[in-house]
């Protein structure tokens, strides 16, 4: 069976996907797969039968996982008996910890708002394991995705068999009774203690990297540095990868042999230590994969198996085993990246990588192979890839593998054994880590190397995979005519084809993005002829005590609007229209300016700009972005699409909401009114100046506040549809019942982001349809 386990792994994958996604396409694919094995691999009937049995086995495993993926806890439950199963995560004044309910045998996520700095310090020192705790709280469903391409937290937790979040008001350890700890709990407690030990005994630069490489925990990392690693495509180095595990195992094995221990003893020792190491490092997919592969190889050596286990067989068996115990993991980005990249490197090693004799060219080829293998998954999950990662990997992989990994283990051992680490070692590592962090942040700002075509659909994913297979085929075929030219052309096609596809898209769209209590509307014209963003949303920041501050507080521009735009493949904003100076409308502009190319900013012509507007002007100046102060009478036309500014008057000196930019747009055969937070006073001025004004779609002013959308205004413009951008359960009571009643009186169809998520109007040659993201 040497070299054939891969065929069973493919059958297992198809079996699970048949259940998890759509049955018919994957069942037909499995049928075709069996035919290809018979036709080209000369599989006998018995072998084909085994592959079919493997497919059916994993089909039923997947079916069982789907059928049991639901909660048994009644939503009215308020009292719970919990065993904490993971390390607590403390971020500012928020504590989160996973637990298992003793009555329902179901996992839950606990959230607790810490009351004081003293309580926070105390909770950091407490053990959450080997105890049964009684807590009272309110069950709530995890958040769902309310915008296209947004992260679906509810689905993410559901695939981990977590269906509820409990909000508790009292200390989670207040009413607990001790229990006998299990071996797994003891190891997890050791991990948590180790992370806390690093945090309290080393500078944060060393502690954060040590926690990541020794224990698989990235919570100590500076969010800006972590983002830089992600943007440059080398964040995998901050996870405990297969390379790290292999190096560590080789190091331990070598040390054992040098100390006179037998090979058999060391193999037995490593077989015992590997499962412990997986738990100690957090059990990420990359660690589990590499540990399983090494475990299988060591096991065959121990049992003196006649057949050598090749790397391809090891990764195939690891994949099958992993999927057997956790079929839901197939959707985990870490799982997909770990197995796909490792598989492609294993397959390419004898055909591609061995053709490079020089170390540096082999490293470059390996880095390129890994980047190409990861490309479809990176684009699907994160919408962007940095080409600079190919070069960065060549510098950072040796640095992490041969300096950081052994060096940080050494620092930890010295500190633990002697209670003190020589200052010279601390100084050296702190300097090197700071320099490497500075370099990665510098490289992350190279937008030229960032490739952002957006999230590919299924058709585009298939095209990507086809092009990649063609690239690898030509690359490994040494006698292929004009090999280098064809490879270069294919790689260029790989990079530009989705952006070309986006440009050919004949559909335009208007999307009211769900940004909570704020406004942000995208206008994207067909064939990429124009991209306009009306407002950016914004997060209100209130001054808090230092200990309450989160490491990376939620910011709607960075966390909602930018991912939405990147998911659409949008990297350039032709006009950023900031209707007025309120934070909930323009606070996210800083993230937009930082992450995307903004060509022009339109702001209202007012006498007294807000502090936020002045800060945006300063940022625009740094980026050489043209800023235009617009007023009544300004307009622009792109093809059949026309935009006319109705308000404010030039050098407006009144109340800020009254001075909002209000304009009419003709888009997709429909007339639109956009007016920011325009109040009734501003509306009255407009209907007096334009007594014949009629619109099809009204963006309701000020989130449906009763200070906007006056009855006289609605009666005159007679909208067929009203869009209200409003936060769910907001403290202002928006939209106001009076406004809703006014709109209903005129038979206006109302769409609300708090209830329906993003609202999109998609149009083609003067006709279109409007649809909410949520049903």
Please give the residue ranges for each predicted region.
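N-terminal leader/targeting segments
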Residues: 1-71, 289
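Non-globular, low-confidence helical/coil segments that flank catalytic cores
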Residues: 122-125, 129, 136, 156, ...
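Hydrophobic alpha-helical transmembrane segments
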Residues: 1-5, 180-192, 211-219, 263, ...
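Hydrophobic alpha-helical transmembrane segments in multi-pass membrane proteins
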Residues: 7, 47-49, 224-390, 453-505, ...
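Residue-level signal for inorganic ion chemistry
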Residues: 82, 334, 374, 601, ...
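Aromatic-rich juxtamembrane segments at the membrane interface
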Residues: 161-293, 298, 574-577, 600, ...
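Membrane-interface helix/helix-cap signal primarily in integral membrane proteins
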Residues: 58-232, 236, 559-566, 572, ...
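Alpha-helical transmembrane segments of multi-pass integral membrane proteins
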Residues: 345-451, 720-725
């Amino acid at each position: 069976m040497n070299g054939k386990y891969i065929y069973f792994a493919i059958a297992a994958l198809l079996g699970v996907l048949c259940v998890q996604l759509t049955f018919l396409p994957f069942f037909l694919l499995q049928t075709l797969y069996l035919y290809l094995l018979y036709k080209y691999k000369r599989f006998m009937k018995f072998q084909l039968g085994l592959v079919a049995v493997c497919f059916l086995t994993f089909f039923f495993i997947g079916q069982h996982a789907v059928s049991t993926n639901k909660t048994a806890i009644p939503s009215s439950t308020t009292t719970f008996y919990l065993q904490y199963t993971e390390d607590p995560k403390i971020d500012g004044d928020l504590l989160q910890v996973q637990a298992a309910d003793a009555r329902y045998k179901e996992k839950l996520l606990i959230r607790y708002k810490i009351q004081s700095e003293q309580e926070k310090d105390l909770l950091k020192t407490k053990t959450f394991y080997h105890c049964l705790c009684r807590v009272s709280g309110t069950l709530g469903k995890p958040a769902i995705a309310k915008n296209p391409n947004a992260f679906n937290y509810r689905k993410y937790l559901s695939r981990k068999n977590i269906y509820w979040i409990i909000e508790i008001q009292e200390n989670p350890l207040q009413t607990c009774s001790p229990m006998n700890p299990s071996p797994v709990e003891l190891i997890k407690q050791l991990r948590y203690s180790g992370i806390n030990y690093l945090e309290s005994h080393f500078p944060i630069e060393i502690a954060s990297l040590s926690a990541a490489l020794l224990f698989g925990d990235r919570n100590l990392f500076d969010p800006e540095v972590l983002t830089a690693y992600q943007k440059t495509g080398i964040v995998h180095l901050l996870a405990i990868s297969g390379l790290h595990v292999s190096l560590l195992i080789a190091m331990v094995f070598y040390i054992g042999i040098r100390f006179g221990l037998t090979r058999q003893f060391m193999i037995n020792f490593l077989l015992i230590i590997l499962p412990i190491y997986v738990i100690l490092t957090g059990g990420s997919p990359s660690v589990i994969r590499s540990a399983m592969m090494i475990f299988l190889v060591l096991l065959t050596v121990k049992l003196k198996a006649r057949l050598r286990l090749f790397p391809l067989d090891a990764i195939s068996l690891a994949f099958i085993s992993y999927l057997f115990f956790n079929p839901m993991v197939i959707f985990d980005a870490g799982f997909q990246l770990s197995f796909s990249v490792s598989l492609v490197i294993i397959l390419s090693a004898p055909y591609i990588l061995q053709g490079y004799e020089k170390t540096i060219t082999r490293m470059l080829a390996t880095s390129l192979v890994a980047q190409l293998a990861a490309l479809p998954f990176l684009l699907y999950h994160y919408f962007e890839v940095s080409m600079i990662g190919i070069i960065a990997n060549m510098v950072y992989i040796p640095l992490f593998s041969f300096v950081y990994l052994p060096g940080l283990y050494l620092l930890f051992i010295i500190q633990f054994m002697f209670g003190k680490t020589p200052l010279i070692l601390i100084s050296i590592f702190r300097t090197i880590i700071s320099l490497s962090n500075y370099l990665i942040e510098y490289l992350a700002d190279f937008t030229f190397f960032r490739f952002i075509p957006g999230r590919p659909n299924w058709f585009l994913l298939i095209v990507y995979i086809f092009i990649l297979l063609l690239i690898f085929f030509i690359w490994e075929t040494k006698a292929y005519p004009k090999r280098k030219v064809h490879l270069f052309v294919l790689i260029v096609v790989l990079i530009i084809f989705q952006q070309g596809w986006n440009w050919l898209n004949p559909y335009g769209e208007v999307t009211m993005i769900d940004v909570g209590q704020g406004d942000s509307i995208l206008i994207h014209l067909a064939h990429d002829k124009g991209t306009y963003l009306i407002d950016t949303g914004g997060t209100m920041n209130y001054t808090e005590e230092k200990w309450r501050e989160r490491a990376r507080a939620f910011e709607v521009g960075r966390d909602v609007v930018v991912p939405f735009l990147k998911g659409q493949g949008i990297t350039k904003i032709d006009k950023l229209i900031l209707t007025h100076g309120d934070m909930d409308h323009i606070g996210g502009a800083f993230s937009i300016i930082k992450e995307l190319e903004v060509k022009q900013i339109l702001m209202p012509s007012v006498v007294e700009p807000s502090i936020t507007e002045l800060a945006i002007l300063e940022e625009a100046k740094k980026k050489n972005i043209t800023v235009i102060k617009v007023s009544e009478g300004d307009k622009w036309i792109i093809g059949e699409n026309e935009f006319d500014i109705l308000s404010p008057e030039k050098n407006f000196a009144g109340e800020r909401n009254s001075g909002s930019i209000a304009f009419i747009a003709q888009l997709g055969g429909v007339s639109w009114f956009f007016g920011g937070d325009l109040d009734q006073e501003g509306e009255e001025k407009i209907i007096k100046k334009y007594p014949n004004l009629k619109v099809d779609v009204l963006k309701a002013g000020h989130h449906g506040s009763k200070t906007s959308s006056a009855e006289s205004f609605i009666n005159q413009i007679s909208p067929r549809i009203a869009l209200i951008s409003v936060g769910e359960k907001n403290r202002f009571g928006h939209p106001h019942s009076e406004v809703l009643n006014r709109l209903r009186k005129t038979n206006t169809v109302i769409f609300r982001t708090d209830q329906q998520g993003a609202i999109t109007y998609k149009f083609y040659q003067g006709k279109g349809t409007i649809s909410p993201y949520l049903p």
